[in-house]
Amino acid sequence: MPKWAHLGLAALLLISTTQEGTADIDWWENASLYQIYPRSFQDSDGDGIGDLKGITSRLGYLKEIGITATWLSPIFTSPMSDFGYDISNFYDIDPIFGTLEDFDDLIVEAKSLGVKIILDFVPNHSSDENVWFEKSVNREDGYDDFYVWDDGKLNEETGARDPPSNWVSVFSGPMWTWNEKRQQYFLHQFQVKQPDLNFTNPMVREHMLDVLKFWLDRGVDGFRIDAVPHIYEHRNADGSYPDEPVSGWGSDPNAYDYHDHIYTKDQPATVDLMYEWREFLDNYRAQNGGDSRVLLAEAYSSVETLSAYFGNSTHQGTQLPMNFQLMYLSGYSTAKDVVGSIDYWMNTMWKEHQTANWVVGNHDTNRVADRMGAHKVDLLNVIVNALPGASVTYYGEEIGMSNVDVECTGDSCEDRDGERTPMQWTAGKNADFSDGESTWLPLSPEYQRYNVQTERGVSRSSLNIFKGLQELKSSSAFLAFKEDGGFSYEAVTEQVLQIIRTNKISEEYRILVNMGNGMEILDGLAPKTYEYVLATAYSTHYSGQKADLSQRIILMPYEAVVLRWLA
């Protein structure tokens, strides 16, 4: 039997927008979300680094390609030890990106276009240059335990003081660092320059609610919460911190994977915190009106944990605990592999909560063209936009951008830079990203081929396929995904994925995706005649062509098509 799912790809077609039989859905449930890495989207002042004015100038593009909301990677004041994920002032914009006035202008323009703005919210830690940390080091009143501090353990053999536990940071090495001035260890789940805030302290939680309110008052539509699993740690009743057991996954005790992080990830208090923040946002909406404010949770956690973050029978949590399952697909993945990845989410999240979201990529992961191959970029875009729920696209994936080899210089090498290179707008100087003489990261050598301007003029380009997919989101068939039988998905062969979206009355879309490198012959898929409405570059079919699915059809290698049936 076919499994859940189905979303479509629409090309330039007339879509039925009647909503017969569709359930009420909130805006985020069927949204097209788009991540912008601000340093790399658009430079407005010629310094080679993207900024807020640049983003504002390009918001019309997001409207053009059908984006519902965009979330911005951190733009707050920061020494940039971790490119903005080390925040020294949660209430201001880093001068690299502009000013609060620039941000307000961006909000005004976004609202005029109907594009929602979501901010990256980094609550787990701050920069060690944040005034909160400086006050905590000095034990100033109210800030003494604003961060996680401990005396450590006395080594009976050496007489020296050792860290409180064997915990290892995400970036390797001890999670505890000695502060000479305070004469205590502080905790940092990430870099040493990113000390962890102490969320067991009510004052910390109040400060973070104040941060949320500050940006809500400026007009943002929600927050993507960074590093959710790391917010709380377990502490024993006697105040000590337990050692974590060895995982068996590695041989280097300084590597993060060496231990099983049962005391430093996904603690029960983190779930309660998500419920607290959701209640805060819902109350804000009740008092101020407008659409729902949304919470996205970045959590590389089990689906059972993500289910808890979403909510239970008595509490609501993050609307979109981010689903990274499709990011684990490779160039060798078959249609059956894709179904397995979909099932992992749907067997829990859809069954329990009737919710789904699908992430294509992000600033920490190689681009689709590198993970799966350039010939499969359109296939993944088709899949994530054909499945029920929200889709999350990393900037540039809609035009098939690839990683760039970035040479290590100086005393550091950021191995995530390859997927963070400037957006490719045109084939001109610096891809029209910047008027400067250089850009903060090098452009792809392929930018003259893969860019927005060029792809606008190619009917089956990745960009136009992407735009066609977004058009289908307003069709009655796509809006019926919460109705019984509104979608299904299955691997009809080892390599061919089929997704169906239907309102069960007057409209049905059938999406076929050939993940393999060989032709696929399909016989008797349905006793009806359909019409092709979208076909990728590898297809021999064209929009408007009829297809009798009671007969045989053939899919070329790496071909994806969308067919429509109307009563």
UniProtKB/Swiss-Prot annotation:
Residues 1-23 form the signal peptide. CDD domains: AmyAc_maltase (cd11328). Keywords: Glycoprotein, Glycosidase, Hydrolase, Signal. Belongs to the glycosyl hydrolase 13 family. The keyword Heme does not apply. Glycans are attached at N30, N124, N198, N312. It is an enzyme of class 3 (hydrolase). This is Maltase A2. GO terms for molecular function: alpha-1,4-glucosidase activity. PANTHER family: ALPHA-AMYLASE FAMILY MEMBER, MALTASE A2-RELATED. Gene3D superfamilies: Glycosidases, Oligo-1,6-glucosidase, Domain 2. The record marks D364 as: Transition state stabilizer. The active site is at D226 (nucleophile), E298 (proton donor). InterPro entries: Glyco_hydro_13_cat_dom (IPR006047), Glycoside_hydrolase_SF (IPR017853), O16G_dom_2 (IPR045857). Its EC number is 3.2.1.20. It holds the Pfam family Alpha-amylase. One of its GO terms (biological process) is carbohydrate metabolic process. It comes from the Eukaryota. It comes from Drosophila melanogaster. It catalyses: Hydrolysis of terminal, non-reducing (1->4)-linked alpha-D-glucose residues with release of alpha-D-glucose.
